[in-house]
């Protein structure tokens, strides 16, 4: 349920917004189609975009609702609550069978069904060979067409399999010092995604290449918050990731940062004044200066008269 719900919207901010409104850990036990629908509608009314531009599901009124998110939530309700799709999934004999189970539902489409099957396979629910099945999405098809002049009648999936199986030979042939994911080589899904990214890169770098897609709609926006990297535990690389990050990053001394921040805040507070305070201070200084000047002049005049008086006494 959680995998399906996240994948449909595929946006961390949407997930976090749901969690903040539900007030609990998102589980099937607290799923309510109407409640979730109202929460997401509220988010959209506030100006939030609840979908990402990647892995978008089909948009239609298949389940009779006017809004896209309502139909997608109805799809989740049908799959998880009514059909209990988890039962045939755990009984499936291979990854391709899971793909066909998911692809039989409306609003998903073949590519989304493949991505969803892969995500489920990353979990502890099932455990099939990741390279046992693949399909090429529209972006990967365009990327393959731009990489190969002629594929000798091979299908797009065959090209992805070939790239997956021959990656080490190609790295050596091209002199590429490819850095694997802590010893984990590229899988079929990775090569599929790479062909898709190649298509996007070529649109910008080589706009003259023949393609039915010319422009790049989405622009990368970095996330200021630090990323807590975590991979499927079955990959057995999370400990290595943490060790590598610990070697790269200096220890962060939070108490010192807090002390420094408080000291800086105090210093800024002592320096920053409002315009009215500055104006009052200037006025006070002006009055003080004027008074001191008058006092000095009066004192000087008295001294002069005293000196004259003393001089008269001498004569």
Residue positions per predicted region:
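Structure-specific DNA junction-binding interface
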Residues: 1-62, 242, 246-264, 312-313
């Amino acid at each position: 349920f959680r995998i399906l719900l996240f994948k449909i919207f595929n946006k961390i901010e949407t997930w976090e917004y749901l969690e903040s409104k539900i007030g609990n850990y998102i589980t099937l036990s607290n799923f309510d189609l109407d409640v979730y629908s109202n929460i997401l509608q509220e988010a959209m009314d506030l100006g939030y975009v609840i979908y990402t531009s990647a892995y978008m599901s089909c948009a239609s009124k298949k389940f009779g609702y006017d809004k896209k998110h309502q139909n997608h939530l109805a799809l989740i309700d049908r799959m998880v609550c009514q059909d209990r799709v988890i039962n045939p999934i755990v009984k499936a004999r291979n990854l391709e069978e899971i793909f066909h189970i998911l692809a039989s539902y409306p609003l998903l489409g073949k590519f989304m069904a493949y991505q969803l099957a892969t995500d489920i396979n990353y979990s502890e629910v099932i455990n099939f060979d990741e390279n046992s099945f693949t399909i090429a999405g529209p972006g990967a098809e365009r990327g393959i067409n731009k990489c190969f002049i002629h594929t000798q009648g091979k299908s797009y999936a065959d090209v992805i399999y070939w790239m997956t199986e021959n990656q080490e030979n190609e790295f050596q042939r091209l002199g590429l010092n490819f850095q694997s994911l802590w010893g984990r080589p590229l899988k079929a899904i990775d090569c599929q995604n790479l062909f898709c990214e190649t298509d996007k890169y070529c649109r910008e770098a080589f706009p003259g290449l023949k393609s039915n897609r010319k422009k790049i709609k989405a622009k990368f926006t970095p996330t200021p918050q630090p990323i807590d990297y975590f991979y499927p535990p079955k990959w057995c690389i999370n400990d290595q990731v943490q060790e590598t990050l610990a070697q790269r990053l200096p220890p962060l001394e939070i108490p010192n940062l807090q002390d420094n921040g408080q000291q800086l805040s105090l210093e800024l507070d002592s320096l920053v004044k409002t315009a009215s305070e500055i104006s009052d201070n200037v006025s006070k200084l002006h009055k003080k200066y004027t008074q001191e000047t008058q006092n000095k002049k009066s004192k000087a005049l008295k001294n002069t008269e005293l000196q004259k008086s003393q001089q008269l006494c001498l004569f």
